[in-house]
Amino acid sequence: MKSGNGPLRVGIGGPVGSGKTALTEKLCKAMSGDYSVAVVTNDIYTKEDAEALVRMQALPSERIVGVETGGCPHTAIREDATINLQAIAGLNAQFPDLDVVFIESGGDNLAATFSPDLADITIYVISVCQGEEIPRKGGPGITRSDLLVINKKDLAPYVGADLTVMDSDATRMRNAMPFVFTDMKRGDGVDRIVGFLKEQGGL
């Protein structure tokens, strides 16, 4: 499923604090040995996520580009993705062998979606800490993303979340589309996500 005009583009969305940057870091580290990888991060007024990925040594700094979206980060991934497409074009020019670009959205809500012009595959990240009812609340990120990641499963006992309930709700809301429980802090579940990207993205 690699884009006709270059690398596979993977959109990573989800609410603030769900673990998007941690997932992006783990995927970069897991895949950069076998593939040419780059990242575009979206922040409203800063380049904080891009700088965090550089500090984490997810990739060499020249492979990480931060864009500032201004007031509404949803627009930059949906209605007018120009700023992101320009960043990807710049990375493509610098790294002609690029295989995968991860596009991390700014912290957003359950209604946020990626334009099909921007992302070939979409991953939506939610956190157990946001409440066990999150999967059944629905929204495009929950119901229509190609892969739903339910992160911070290790914290379920501390926040009163029942993973069995979340599993049942996610199964019902997603109509057999895949989802995975993860603990990004420990890297638990990363292999399954990499496998999904390889299979669905034709890598």
Swiss-Prot record:
One of its GO terms (cellular component) is cytoplasm. Pfam families: cobW (PF02492). GTP binds at G14, P15, V16, G17, S18, G19, K20, T21. The keyword Chloroplast does not apply. Signal peptide: none annotated. It is found in: Cytoplasm. The keyword GTP-binding applies. Facilitates the functional incorporation of the urease nickel metallocenter. This process requires GTP hydrolysis, probably effectuated by UreG. Homodimer. UreD, UreF and UreG form a complex that acts as a GTP-hydrolysis-dependent molecular chaperone, activating the urease apoprotein by helping to assemble the nickel containing metallocenter of UreC. The UreE protein probably delivers the nickel. This is Urease accessory protein UreG. It comes from Agrobacterium fabrum (strain C58 / ATCC 33970) (Agrobacterium tumefaciens (strain C58)).
